[in-house]
Amino acid sequence: MYVSLFIGCAIVLDIYCYTLYGHLHVNVSFDGQWCQLKAYLFYVSGCGFFYSYLLQAIYRLCRITLFRKPSLQTFRLYVCGIVVQWLLSFVQVIPVLLLGTFEYLPHDYHCQIAIHNVRGLLIGLALVHTIPISLTTMCYAYTMFYIQKISATIKTARQLATDQRDFLVLKRIFIVLTTLIASGMPAFSIGLYFQFTGHLPYWSTQFQWLSATFAMLIVSIILIFVSPNVPKFRMYFAQ
């Protein structure tokens, strides 16, 4: 999760540097394979970020619903899961690249899915966001159903308390994903507005990146409180 977040932030910083340089040297162009590759890696990092939450959701699901199978909770298994997570991320974004969805924006000096390209936005949404978010939501829904309908009849009070803690973490993961989805809706709405009116505000791309940056900030803050080690740090510094 943190690796994908770091890669995404590094690419965003690189994009800002290119954009700033382009505004200072208006005749320059950065169109090319490297521009396309950076856009591809940015979406790979985003896909990997969502899959990291799916992996956490699967872990919590196994701890709660499959607690009698410790083999599904081993460290080695989830290391393999991380490898699979990144393989899926690289593979899923390849169609976005091959379909020519990434465009060079001459006024912004970088490549991305243009905000007026609703087809491209839908392809990116389907391949990058929908699959991991849908699976994570299914894990969340089934875990909630299990705790409410089944868990109380077969587990001890101590096990139920552990389940509640795991479910709380899973709930916070769902809140983070909801925040990320909500952050992308304004940009998507601008794309739909362009389809109906043929008018695209000049600040649309900047607004898209502003909403994405704001979402990263919110997620970073939420992650501080989601982390199970935060109470330990508080107790340590309170001493």
Where are these regions (language model features)?
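Seventh transmembrane helix
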Residues: 179-192, 200, 204-239
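Membrane-water interface of transmembrane alpha-helices
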Residues: 53-58, 139-152
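Hydrophobic alpha-helical segments of membrane proteins
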Residues: 10-14, 90-94, 134-138, 169-192, ...
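Transmembrane alpha-helices of multi-pass eukaryotic membrane proteins
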Residues: 1, 38-39, 76-82, 121-129, ...
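Loop architecture of class A 7-transmembrane GPCRs
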Residues: 22-44, 78, 90-134
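Intracellular effector-coupling site of seven-transmembrane GPCRs
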Residues: 3, 145-185
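Class A GPCR helix-loop hinge within the 7TM core
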Residues: 46-81
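Extracellular TM2-ECL1-early TM3 structural module of rhodopsin-like
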Residues: 3-55
